[in-house]
Amino acid sequence: MRGTRKYQHVIETPDPGKWELAGYEESLPISEKSNPMTRELDKADPSQLVQLLRDCDAEIFQEEDENLIHYHRLYSESVLKTMGDVAKRVQEVLKNPDDSLVVLSGCGTSGRLALLLANSFNGLLKGLHKTPCYCYIMSGGDRSIVTSQESSEDNPQLGAQELEKVCEGKKNVLFIGISCGLSAPFIAGQLDFCMRHLDVYLPVLVGFNPVSMARNERIEGWHSSFRQVAERLQTLHDSQKGFILNPAVGPEGVSGSSRMKGGSATKILLETLLLVAHKAESNVPVTEKCLLEILRTYERAHKVTYSQSKKIAALMKQTATSLQKKGHLYILGWGTLGLVGIMDAVECVPTYQADWRDVRGFITGGYHSIENKEGDLSSLGPQFSISHEDFVKNVLPSVSETDTVLLIFTLDDDLNQIEKLVALVKEKTSNIQVICHATAGQYLPNSLKKTIPSIIGLTWPILFLEYEGAFIQKFQRELSTKWILDTVTSGAYTLRGKIFRNFMVDFKINNSKLFHRATSVLQRLTGQSHQRCTEVLLQSIYGEQTLSEQIRNTTIAGHVEAAASQDKVLPVAIVSLLRSCTIQDSRSRINSSLSIRSAIESSMNVPGRKRGAEDSESR
Ligand code: F1P
């Protein structure tokens, strides 16, 4: 442990990683760097995978190290101070709920978290018979709750329009824009809109890169880059007319997968800040101590969660086996834990090119429990059926021994109903697993215990804190569930050969960020120039060896649209570059390989191949 640590930590956070050293993958922002800890993620077995991802998650709580690059961390004084400053401004909104609003906005996982958080704090207010004053925006609208709609993320104008719409008639709006990578144009558009109307709006940006690492290419069809917007926002900091909350939490265990640490850190940071603001309303002043007290409960949650590592590894192994046999993972959650399950399932589609049926989430009460703005979306198609009734009616009849069913609940939920569902599922598959949250002193009834072969049991301490105490426990359970599911699904897809080293190599290129990520992964794995990598990526997207002038002159948005109808775009480009073979040859090689990973691995060892940058740097 380092001597510089200021706080007594609940968990043992790892020592600073090599990624903090100057020059480490210098051209990449932290959120896109490859984590040195997980370089051999693809070779790990389930227990090692859990351990590696556990250590990556622990980096969220690591402190700033003055001997290294001066990255601000969650516990840095400047970050705690900004959290306190924003909390005080939230308090002002809470005092005048009629013409004020707190808007939380994000894309993908960040948008789903905006929904979860807005509902939590509206629930907190309603419980006190106060007016709800939170609202959420997610790019792509409510359909993005259950499906991935990554392309709307690229539209800054749309972001601004949506914001204007939800704030109509309000005199005081605190806007919280979440973009883990400081990258989403949708959020840039909203921040820019706020900065043009500072009489009404207070813009707050949440993400996990320094401003100097925010995305720097000019947004297509717009006037600025994300970085320029963030820099403008930074200048408002001293006058308290705008804030940026961007502690470094380290690179993701799976490079670029911001749903993981980025999502967890968003939840930790914002829930802490908002809870303190609500406490402060009851005349408790906003202090660093209040913030630290809550942050520590999340550290404790990390410890409690990963005390179940063995069982998490078993669930991961079971899930990987199901997926390998063309089976499924069905996640059935109660209350907000159901939403956490849906969040995790949805992201498997863009991150691993999974079919939407492979991993699915269901929630008790369906849309009614989610409390989304657009109400019941189930008429939009089978993908949008998310209630337990939908599962029983439409999915259960075809469940078989190859499928895994995971139930997630707390001991305060309807245990009779759970027991009945367990019995129904057991008629179809013996692969039934449970994540069960209890408060100290509560026990799972024997009747349930006997029927479920494998239980991940998490017991949370009783928190003797006024009304908010119950919310802290809810937040801990949600985060703990998120950590387990992130680890299980990322690990299962790693075991299925969807990861090479720690790079996602088979993701959907459905927005500009992902287009750039694809080129960057190509460069890192092959050591070839940016220009050459872009060329081969385009060959793979269009399935043409010779690129026409028209293709070369197409915008990135156009390439993204073309990529939408193709599968395995990135793996085909990687193998084609490594083997100097045609796109067609590469595709047939991949199609006849055991996995994407094995196709890349065998291409790495082709005689005479030029060594890649990654090879020489660290292997
Ligand atoms: C937004 C996001 C992620 C998702 C995927 C694509 O990222 O939709 O939530 O996991 O990586 O991007 P960000 O704007 O929060 O960085």
From Swiss-Prot:
Localization annotation: Nucleus; Cytoplasm; Mitochondrion
Principal subcellular localisation of the protein: nucleus
Annotated coiled-coil segments of the chain: none
Tree of life domain: Eukaryota
A molecular function (GO) term: carbohydrate binding
Sequence similarity: Belongs to the GCKR family.
Protein name, per record: Glucokinase regulatory protein
Source species of the chain: Xenopus laevis
Gene that this sequence comes from: gckr
